[in-house]
């Protein structure tokens, strides 16, 4: 049963990613089912893997919630690495290049992109190992830091996202102070939320950035649906019919958010044991 719940939760995280991605891109790029299900398939893979690695008891709503957030992070990281360093695509359709760029100009050498991508992934892995060891030290009793200080470390993904976003966007759009600090601030908030449901520092770190992406993308995509995303600024809408067709996916998206909120409520009601307890 745990495996089945992990599959469903992973699928939900993947479809959530797929839907906001489709909603913002389809008027400019059109729609294909293989592209839409790409994130869903990643979620189906990562959901069970995260469950197995952390040995989560999915009979508890709190663990389903953190599984969703952690899976979300894994899916996003995989897709961003793929799009930035691996995928070959014409960048002229974008106002802001989506693949690795320097001062707003795409890096033409595929080999150079792969090398930079390797070191990027290496840094992420090293950060993950450091957080994993921090978690071991905490549970062994050798780390007696204030929980709110630990949450600063758990929000490290927000800083990685902020610097990566500034590197990509600032040469084209200019540097925005609020935009730069938004991800770290929201990441700290969700690290706090995740810490109410689990005392695993690594899971808190993963949920921190996972839920940050989920909420920020929901805000940008669905609260301002007529405003083109930065990467398509000034670009023509080539598939205007999808401004209407995409709305058919809204019930699924809303249902997934309801699922997440219900798991959070049940987790609180059932008395989840977290890093932070009131």
Please name every model-derived segment.
Residues 83-97, 171-175, 221-236:
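A cytosolic-side transmembrane-helix exit/cap motif
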Residues 38-56, 182-197:
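A generic, lipid-embedded transmembrane alpha helix
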Residues 104-115, 229-258:
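Interfacial loop-to-transmembrane junctions
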Residues 113-130, 247-271:
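Final/C-terminal transmembrane alpha-helix of multipass membrane proteins
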Residues 98-174:
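Generic multipass alpha-helical transmembrane bundles of integral membrane proteins
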Residues 52-81, 201-218:
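Alpha-helical transmembrane-segment detector that highlights a single hydrophobic TM helix
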Residues 1-5, 25-33, 54-67, 132-152, ...:
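Membrane-helix interface and helix-disruption motif detector
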Residues 5-25, 156-165:
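N-terminal signal-anchor/start-transfer transmembrane helix
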């Amino acid at each position: 049963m745990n495996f089945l719940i992990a599959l469903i939760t992973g699928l939900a995280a993947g479809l959530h990613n797929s839907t906001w991605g489709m909603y913002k891109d389809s008027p400019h790029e059109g729609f294909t089912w293989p592209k839409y299900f790409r994130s869903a398939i990643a979620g189906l893979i990562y959901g069970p893997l995260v469950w197995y690695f952390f040995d989560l008891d999915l009979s508890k709503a709190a663990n389903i919630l953190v599984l969703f957030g952690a899976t979300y992070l894994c899916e996003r990281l995989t897709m961003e690495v793929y799009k930035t360093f691996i995928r070959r695509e014409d960048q002229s359709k974008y106002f802001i290049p989506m693949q690795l760029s320097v001062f707003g100009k795409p890096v033409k050498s595929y080999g150079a992109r792969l090398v930079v991508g390797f070191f990027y992934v290496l840094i992420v892995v090293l950060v993950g190992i450091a957080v994993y060891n921090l978690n071991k030290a905490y549970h062994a009793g050798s780390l007696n830091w204030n929980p709110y200080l630990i949450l600063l470390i758990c929000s490290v993904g927000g800083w990685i996202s902020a610097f990566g976003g500034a590197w990509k966007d600032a040469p084209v759009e200019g540097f925005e102070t609020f935009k730069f600090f938004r991800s770290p601030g929201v990441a700290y908030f969700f690290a706090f939320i995740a810490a109410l449901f689990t005392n695993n520092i690594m899971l808190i770190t993963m949920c921190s950035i996972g839920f940050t992406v989920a909420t920020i993308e929901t805000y940008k995509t669905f609260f301002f649906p007529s405003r083109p995303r930065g990467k398509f600024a000034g670009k023509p809408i080539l598939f205007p019919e999808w401004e209407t067709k995409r709305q058919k996916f809204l019930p699924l998206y809303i249902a997934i958010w309801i699922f997440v909120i219900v798991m959070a409520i049940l987790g609180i009601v059932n008395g989840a044991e977290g890093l932070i307890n009131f």
